[in-house]
């Protein structure tokens, strides 16, 4: 289990992991790592929250929120933000399904992708600032948001098909079973309930689950399935929806 966690941490983040801790795991078994997603999100969110707390006293709430969002993006190498941009470029191109997938594979940033990045990043900064001004615990909120967003991404993997013939997303999409999905969502719910007691966190997770489920169905209808890019988009939007639900 520990090797699986380190392998997933190395796979979906840019945090330094000693190679000997993550080596030796068959790539075909990576799908089992979905259950570690909420824990990895918890770690990323906690680090981002600590950055906010450390900078708030010196720079004020808005700049602390800016740097916490920046650190979160850097820890993932902008991987999920890139997926969000590619997904929006493809889906909003109003082309055929095959052409949408081609556009999503293009490394160049389009207008829709750029607008999506600006909106989501700016929205996160504003929501974090508002939560802080309302006296909400930012460390717990960010940790829970990152855990839940990565946990609910399982909804785009279970009983979904991969829209391409090959790609990194194929490691998870259509490969996880009902038990793994329930365990992943259960862990995310536990983290949300513990970090944000009084059902506040659980209620925000329910809202996030509904939003991600609807997103998954819309993407399935539009693209014929999911890709690694759509998983990244779901994680980014899941974080934002969860934080908005806390307001």
Curated annotation (Swiss-Prot):
Gene: cobS
Chief location bin: membrane
Keywords tagged on the record: Cell inner membrane, Cell membrane, Cobalamin biosynthesis, Magnesium, Membrane, Transferase, Transmembrane, Transmembrane helix
Cited NCBIfam families: cobS
Stored InterPro entries: CobS
GO CC field: plasma membrane
Keyword Transmembrane helix: yes
Function: Joins adenosylcobinamide-GDP and alpha-ribazole to generate adenosylcobalamin (Ado-cobalamin). Also synthesizes adenosylcobalamin 5'-phosphate from adenosylcobinamide-GDP and alpha-ribazole 5'-phosphate.
UniProt keyword Iron-sulfur present: no
EC identifiers of the protein: 2.7.8.26
UniProt pathway annotation: Cofactor biosynthesis; adenosylcobalamin biosynthesis; adenosylcobalamin from cob(II)yrinate a,c-diamide: step 7/7
GO molecular function, one term: cobalamin 5'-phosphate synthase activity
Protein name as catalogued: Adenosylcobinamide-GDP ribazoletransferase
Family: Belongs to the CobS family.
Residue ranges crossing the lipid bilayer per the database entry: 34-54, 59-79, 113-133, 138-158, 194-214
Cofactor(s) required, per the database record: Mg(2+)
Membrane topology listed for this record: Multi-pass membrane protein
Localization, UniProt: Cell inner membrane
Cross-referenced PANTHER family: ADENOSYLCOBINAMIDE-GDP RIBAZOLETRANSFERASE
